[in-house]
C-alpha cells in the first residue's frame, strides 16, 4: 500500500495536470455550422462565442423565426462539439484517477 507522501504526490501531479488541461481547453476554439451551413459559429473553450456568421442568402430565403432556429441549431452544435473536445482532453486524467482508485 502506498504511503501518505506518495498519495499526496499523486494528487498534486493530477491537480497540475487538470489545471494544464483546463488552460488548454479554455484556449481552444471550436467552429460549428447549422445543417446546411447557413450559420457558422465560433466559440472558445470557456464557452464564449466569438462570432456568429449568417449567410446573406439565408437572410433572403428565411423569415426571422426560421433564422433564429438555424442560429440555435448552430449554437447547440458548437456547444456539443466543445463538450466532446473537452471530454476528450480530460479522458486521460479521468482514466488515471480510476486506476488509482482500483
State the predicted function of each range:
Residues 11-14, 18-21, 25, 75, ...:
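Amphipathic alpha-helical coiled-coil segments
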Residues 71-96:
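C-terminal structural segments of small proteins and small subunits
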Amino acid at each position: 500500500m502506498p504511503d501518505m507522501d506518495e498519495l499526496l504526490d499523486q494528487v498534486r501531479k493530477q491537480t497540475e495536470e487538470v489545471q494544464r488541461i483546463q488552460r488548454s481547453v479554455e484556449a481552444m476554439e471550436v467552429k460549428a455550422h447549422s445543417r446546411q451551413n447557413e450559420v457558422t459559429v465560433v466559440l472558445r473553450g470557456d464557452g464564449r462565442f466569438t462570432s456568429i456568421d449568417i449567410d446573406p442568402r439565408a437572410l433572403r430565403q428565411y423569415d426571422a423565426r426560421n433564422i433564429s432556429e438555424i442560429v440555435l441549431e448552430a449554437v447547440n452544435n458548437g456547444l456539443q462539439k466543445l463538450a466532446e473536445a473537452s471530454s476528450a482532453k480530460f479522458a486521460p486524467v479521468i482514466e488515471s484517477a480510476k486506476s488509482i482508485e482500483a
